Curated annotation (Swiss-Prot):
One of its GO terms (cellular component) is host cell mitochondrion. This is Protein X. InterPro entries: Transactivation_prot_X. The gene is X. Residues 28-38 have a biased composition (Low complexity). Residues 68-117 are annotated as: Mitochondrial targeting sequence. One of its GO terms (biological process) is viral genome replication. Multifunctional protein that plays a role in silencing host antiviral defenses and promoting viral transcription. Does not seem to be essential for HBV infection. May be directly involved in development of cirrhosis and liver cancer (hepatocellular carcinoma). Most of cytosolic activities involve modulation of cytosolic calcium. The effect on apoptosis is controversial depending on the cell types in which the studies have been conducted. May induce apoptosis by localizing in mitochondria and causing loss of mitochondrial membrane potential. A fraction may be phosphorylated in insect cells and HepG2 cells, a human hepatoblastoma cell line. Phosphorylated in vitro by host protein kinase C or mitogen-activated protein kinase. N-acetylated in insect cells. May form homodimer. May interact with host CEBPA, CFLAR, CREB1, DDB1, E4F1, HBXIP, HSPD1/HSP60, NFKBIA, POLR2E and SMAD4. Interacts with host SMC5-SMC6 complex and induces its degradation. Interacts with host TRPC4AP; leading to prevent ubiquitination of TRPC4AP. Interacts with host PLSCR1; this interaction promotes ubiquitination and degradation of HBx and impairs HBx-mediated cell proliferation. It is found in: Host cytoplasm; Host nucleus; Host mitochondrion. Residues 25-49 are annotated as: Disordered.
Amino acid sequence: MAARLCCQLDPARDVLCLRPVGAESRGRSLSGSLGAVSPPSPSAVPANDGSHLSLRGLPVCSFSSAGPCALRFTSARRMETTVNAPRSLPTVLHKRTLGLSGRSMTWIEDYIKDCVFKDWEELGEEIRLKVFVLGGCRHKLVCSPAPCNFFTSA
């Protein structure tokens, strides 16, 4: 089952939001099979229009009508190249959630914001998405049992 989404920049919060196609939004439509998940629990997020979506690896707040709290995401190809050159990005994020990293995350956020629009708008990379929550989001990722805890914020 595929979910059809739009990518929209929210300048008020300076975050990228995913919106189901058909909801009020602007941005490039995304389409891809990202795996199946169970819908988020009603108590976890506000009333939403995402219970029909089949997505893996998104925080439950992604399904909220208000959009995700503080979500940054990029293509899997990018995560395998420049960002990962000096170190593993998941390891860096995991250390940050534990309060172990003293390095600012601004360089990662800037890099991701730069490459998201190039990859999606110019290259059309829509299917192989990897999701990273870089802070400010209290929701856990919706994913199958696996070592996903390093993608959640503290």
